[in-house]
Every structure is written in C-alpha cells, then in structure tokens.
Amino acid sequence: MRILITNDDGINAPGLETLEAIATEVAGPAGEVWTVAPAFEQSGVAHCISYVHPTLIAELGPRRFAAEGTPADCVLAAIADVMRDNPPDLVLSGVNRGNNSGENVMYSGTVGGAMEAALQGLPAIALSQYMGSRTAVLDDPFQAARMHGPRLIRQLLDYGDWTSDEDFRLFYNINFPPCDAGSVKGTRVAPQGRRQGVRFEVEPYHAPNGRRFLWVLGGSQTAEATPESDVDANMRDYISLTPMRPDLTCHKTLAELRGVLEEG
C-alpha cells in the first residue's frame, strides 16, 4: 500500500510524526509512506488552494517533501507532481493538534486536505487529537491517536465504502478524545455537531509605528455541544468518526424551494 500523508500544522509538527508512525504501521513492511506537508503552519486555511501564485516545493529526504502552500496544495502537488507516476492508495491528513469536530470542520486545513483528496477520487481520512487538561500532562499528548489510529484506519479500509449516494466521494473525519489512550471508551459514529457558545473574537492591536492590527481569537472548545454529535462523543471520551463529502447543499431546503420557486 502507498500512503500519502499531509497536515496543516506544518512539516515539523509532532502530530505529523505521529501520523508517519500510524501510516507506517498501516502500510506494512512492503508499503510506502510519502509525506508532502506545508513548510509552515497552515491552521485555519480550510480548503484553500494557492492558484494565484506558484508553490515552492523542496525535497527534504526520501519520500519527504515540504511545500510552501496549504494542505490542499500539498495533496495536489503530490498527485500531479511528486507521486504522478505512482499515485497513493490512501491519503491521511493530520494528526492535528486540536479537535476538528463541530464547527471547526469548516475552518480546518486538516479536513481541507482530506476533502481535496476525495475530490481527486482518492480514499482519504482526516485525523485530529482533541487537546485538554488531561493531555497536557502526558509525555505524548497524541497517544490516543497513536494507539487507536491504525486500528480505525484498517477498519475503514476493510469497510471499503468511499462513495456516497450522490456524485461525490466520501472521506472520513476522526477525532480522538482529550484523554490518555487507556481512558478511551470506544468509537462512536456521529454527525458533525455544533457548540452554541463558541464564537471568534477580534482584538485590536496598535503597533508603535501607528499601524492598527486585528488578532482573531478562538473561543472556548468546551462549550456544550449538540447531543450525540462528534463533539459530544469526544467530551465523553469516545473517538468520533464522521463520514463526510464535499457537498454543502441543504437537500431538505432544496426540495422545499423547488416547490415554492420553480415554475414550468
């Protein structure tokens, strides 16, 4: 098996090292793990692609590349250039330092990398490690992902469904709870949730030279979540697994609007 890995925290992020270990275990002795990851942190870029300027790419070692672009750029660089003659069988994006559940999905570069792979027709999984007070005291805050990740990926590969009921390929979003590996209670297949109390804030800053800047600050990640959602599962020490597709259509409203607005 040939696996491509990327992330949004950057080529030197500890979560990418965790993902390399996970991918190596899944690929097996005869497999290959290729890394094409951002040269610099790209958190919060979602599914952005850098088509307005070229992307500098550097080979750092055998099957290891850094691109000055987003996770989606990295996936495209791998498919169109680095791995053009031998495309990946699976794309893994992560392991993100922090959860990508709930509304975080919409901002996540980690999810964006997996989504781009799905749009390119490849099986893809995004992996994120929820962080909190219990992971902060661990020598390896990614240990839940490191221990449980290979098993979940194998289960999804065995399940083998990468198509949806529409024209889009599925990809999967996995979030590991904010606890040590031994405290994980199991896995819950859950929908994307919503935390009503989470809001971004903008803080102004005036530089000594008179220029005015704005810092975008994230809200609390512990606000009450939609019951039985991905966030809810994580807060109860379960791994959440959410099947997703690159389609934002609200099909319920689509059907209703057709009856109201369409003529002829």
Curated annotation (Swiss-Prot):
Chief location: cytoplasm
The species this protein was found in: Paracoccus denitrificans (strain Pd 1222)
Pfam families to which the protein is assigned, alphabetical: SurE
Designated name of the protein: 5'-nucleotidase SurE
Gene3D superfamilies: Survival protein SurE-like phosphatase/nucleotidase
Positions annotated to bind a divalent metal cation: D8, D9, S43, N96
Function summary: Nucleotidase that shows phosphatase activity on nucleoside 5'-monophosphates.
Protein encoded by which gene: surE
InterPro entries reported in the protein's UniProt record: SurE (IPR030048), SurE-like_Pase/nucleotidase (IPR002828), SurE-like_sf (IPR036523)
Names of the cofactor(s): a divalent metal cation
The keyword Hydrolase appears for this protein: yes
Cofactor binding comment, as recorded: Binds 1 divalent metal cation per subunit.
Enzyme Commission designation: 3.1.3.5
Top-level taxon in the UniProt lineage: Bacteria
Compartments reported by the entry: Cytoplasm
GO molecular-function term, one example from the UniProt record: 5'-nucleotidase activity
GO CC annotation terms, alphabetical: cytoplasm
